[in-house]
Curated annotation (Swiss-Prot):
SUPFAM superfamilies: HD-domain/PDEase-like, Nucleic acid-binding proteins. This is 3'-5' exoribonuclease YhaM. The lineage of its organism: Bacteria, Bacillati, Bacillota, Bacilli, Bacillales. Keywords: DNA-binding, Exonuclease, Hydrolase, Nuclease. Residues 163-279 form the HD domain. GO terms for molecular function: 3'-5'-RNA exonuclease activity; DNA binding.
Length: 320
């Protein structure tokens, strides 16, 4: 297998295998159909166009298919794109499998679970601790495998758990600076805030939105589950409502998906930590293939901005 799409520079020829993450049909200005393919390998993703595609191409080059491509890395409107020279479906003779093309979190699921469990052990409020532990255990397998999103940030295998671990570590540092923060609430809110995504999303590979995800969303899903968990465990009190509020308000604004803004201190900080970690992941991913003195591709979720890597920073990759 080749060195990976992340390691190629604009103008370089390449020949490699890719997993098709999505295939979208459209019609060009000349009236001919084409496919926009999002291709991935173990290092990253890239867009490619398959011009003048036939009905057979549409049936062959679908989401989840593994293909062999020869082409050249190019740039279009500030974004890298793979110019396809030839493309074919793979066969058993190629000896490739889907797991070869999936990017994963830099920490193992066991390591992440151990870290998260330690934060739960540190909780002093038994009601908050029990509800958090119960919900995590209920969804543990999916939680450790799922991405945090379909696009934008932590959209890789185990991305959801990695997002939570990073947020918890930020929260611990902030709590040391601001001792008025209730770490039980903050840690529980971080662990639970995106847990509804195990029902909102379809799985760790070829991730799409489920019917529940489209009609309810991860916030509503988890708010309901917190209530059900409290009933199941026989827990009453304000802790239940506060945990629900933490999940409900973590997007901060109605136009961002939260029906209520943060109205307690820990909910506001939870939103900020979530935003920091998501944006850091987006910027880090965009700057991975950028050399010092260059700008990244535009990041749609960050006002379509490009980010600059200062000249005095070390190159990110050994491209030899």
């Amino acid at each position: 297998m080749s060195r990976g799409i992340l390691y190629y520079q604009v103008g370089e020829a390449l020949e490699s295998y890719f997993l098709i993450k999505s295939a979208t049909k459209a019609v060009a200005s000349n009236g001919k159909p084409f496919l926009t393919l999002i291709l991935s390998d173990h290092t990253g993703e890239i867009e490619a166009k398959l011009w003048g595609c036939s009905p057979e191409d549409e049936a062959t080059f679908v989401s989840g298919a593994i293909v062999h491509i020869s082409g050249q890395l190019s740039e279009y409107r500030g974004r890298q794109q793979l110019k396809i020279g030839s493309i074919r479906p793979t066969t058993a003779m190629d000896q490739v499998k889907v797991s070869d093309f999936v990017r994963s979190a830099p920490l193992s699921p066991d390591d992440m679970l151990e870290q998260i469990t330690q934060y739960i052990f540190e909780m002093k409020n038994p009601k908050i601790q029990r509800m958090t532990r119960h919900l995590l255990k209920k969804h543990q397998t999916a939680f450790l495998e799922y991405p945090a999103a379909t696009t934008n940030h932590h959209e890789f295998v185990s991305g959801l758990a990695y997002h939570v671990v990073c947020m918890l570590n930020v929260a611990k540092s902030l709590a040391a600076l601001y001792p008025t923060l209730d770490t039980d609430l903050l840690y529980a809110g971080i662990i639970l805030h995106d847990l509804g995504k195990v029902k909102e999303l379809s799985g760790p590979i070829d991730t799409t939105y489920t019917i529940e995800g489209k009609l309810l969303g991860h916030i509503s899903i988890l708010v309901n589950e917190i209530g059900e968990t409290a009933n199941e465990l026989g827990i009453e009190g304000e802790e239940v409502i506060i945990l629900q509020h933490l999940v409900l308000a973590h997007h901060s604004k109605g136009e961002w998906g939260s029906p209520k803004p943060p109205l307690i201190r820990e909910a506001e900080i939870l939103h900020m930590i979530d935003n920091i970690d998501a944006k850091m992941n987006m910027m880090d991913r965009a700057l991975e293939r950028v050399q010092p003195g260059e700008f990244s591709e535009r990041i749609k979720a960050m006002d379509n901005r490009s980010f600059y890597k200062p000249n005095f920073h070390e190159p990110p990759l050994d491209l030899s």
